[in-house]
Amino acid sequence: SMRIYVCDTILITMNPMEKKLFHLFSLKSKKEIGKRISLGQGPDEMIRPSIIKFNENQILIFDVATFTLFTYDTEDFISNENTIPLERKTIELQAYGEIGLLSDNLIGSTYNPKNQFIKFDNNGKKVGEFGYYPVVADLSYTDDEKLEAFKSSFVTNMKDRIAVCYKWTDLIDIYDQNGQLKKRIHGPEHS
């Protein structure tokens, strides 16, 4: 699925399955600036990338297919068609799907019935797990049923909060940077 990222006057779209995955646009001129990062398995290519940080200094892109985190200088990424990463790190344990930034750590969703998230340090080494699945009164789940019933996606504010949105239930969990549940929000459709 296509994704859109914005910082200042630059808009980036991530276009899966195109030869060049990222298309850059100027919001001022409303014109395309260029295309970046080839689809593929070469050293500077990616397969399933998502931008997890985009500011005036740097762009962090995680390729979920190779568990690799790429760091780019924002100015170089925008102005240089053949931009190369300043740094490339492989995440130690395979996170399942999404990766987010939380303070100085990376957070990855897991396919684990005990904890929803893995926390990684700056070097991609696992430093902990956290996140508890909701408990439903009068229901007990097998591990596989629990993983399916509480499928979720998450977003971070990059500093100290994670919002977990469940796909099949009207529920949002908010965690802090230490993995403590701060708030559980039930919507009108919650059952």
Region roles according to the model:
Residues S1, Q41-R48, T90-L93, V136-E148, ...:
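Short glycine-/Asp-/Thr-/Trp-enriched loop segments that recur within the blades
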Residues S1-L21:
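Beta-strand-rich domains and repeat architectures in extracellular enzymes and scaffolds
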Residues T13-M17, I61-T66, G108-N112, V164-K167:
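Conserved beta-strand positions in repeat-built beta-propeller and related beta-rich domains
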Residues T66-F67, D73-N105, S109:
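Asp-box/WD-like beta-propeller blade repeats and closely related beta-sheet repeat scaffolds
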Residues M2-V6, S50-F54, G97-L102, E145-K159:
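Structural signature of eukaryotic scaffold interfaces centered on beta-propeller domains
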Residues L27-S29, D73-F77, D121-K125, D176-Q180:
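Short loop/turn segments that connect beta-strands within beta-propeller blades
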Residues K31-A65, P85-T90:
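Blade-loop segments of beta-propeller domains
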